[in-house]
Structure formats: C-alpha cells, structure tokens
Amino acid sequence: MKLGAVILVAGVGIPDEEMEKFLEMKRPTIFEQMIVSYQRAGVADIALVTRDGMADKIEQTLHRRGVTFLDIESDSFELAVLKGLSYLSDTCERIFVGDIRFPFFQPDILVMMQKRQAELLGAVYGGMFGDLICTSQACARNICKKLEQQIEESAEMAEGTVRSIGVAAFWK
C-alpha cells in the first residue's frame, strides 16, 4: 500500500513573520522533523503546499529529502488541501493531511491510523480532534470534488456580490 502525506504550510493562517521564524530555526528544522516522522511511518510521497514562492526558502533545508513542493497563489486552506490531495490521490492508497503548526507526532500514530480501514480518520488527543487526518484514495477524490465545487460557488458568489453593487469586475 502506497502512503502519501500533504503538509500544509499555506492556508493555515500563519503570518509571514511567524513563517520567517520557522525558516530561521536551527537544524534540524521543524520541516525536517515532520518529514522524517512521516518517512519512518512508511510514507513514500510527501507534498508540501506553500504559498507565494515560499517553496524556494524551504527547499534549501529540505533538498534530498524526497519532498514535492506545490505552490499556490493565495493563503486559502481549501485551495491548499485541494492542491495536495489532487496531487497524491492518483498514486497513493492512503493519504495523511497535516498542518505545519502541529509538527510533532509519533510515527507509530501514523502506522495505527493507516491500518484502520476507515475512509476518513482524524487523530484525537484528550478527547478533541487534532490536525492530522488520514483518508482513503476514494475519500480524497470525493473531498477534491467537494472542494472544487465550494471554490467555484465562492467565486460565483463573489462575482454576484460585486455585480449587485454595480462595480465593474475584472476576473483573471
């Protein structure tokens, strides 16, 4: 079974100043620790979703780690998840989605999660859902369809709102 992981850097609400602090940390970086945890659990394909060209800065510390960088233009959570899941859903049977704000977890947690046959599984700590999920390939594809639909509806609503107040709009 091929495992994949999406690490969200974009769309998680981290201000640029805080992200700079992440990037300035001494070795091993938080990014490296998170990637090693995924790899120890057997994850073969890791996609790091970044924004605004941030991949170049992060890539300097992660070269030769087997990570794919996916860059998005906005800081949209939905777009970040969509980009990562779309990239991995054709090749991976189980996909983890994690958030860079919560980089520390034990690899055995990932092993336990991937062995469960649930379509969508969230890690729970202290009775509350954490920011790590595991999804099946089929569920990932369904999530992508729903996110694409949400994003499209959002754009249509924004366009309708702009037109209703009489402002001419230019859409790329």
Model-derived features: where do they sit?
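Donor nucleotide-sugar binding loop of glycosyltransferases
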Residues: 27
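Short glycine-enriched, charge-decorated loop/helix-capping segments at active-site entrances
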Residues: 19-24
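Conserved N-terminal catalytic core of the sugar/cofactor nucleotidyltransferase
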Residues: 3, 30-94
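Conserved beta-loop-beta/alpha segment of the NTase-like Rossmann-fold superfamily
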Residues: 69-141
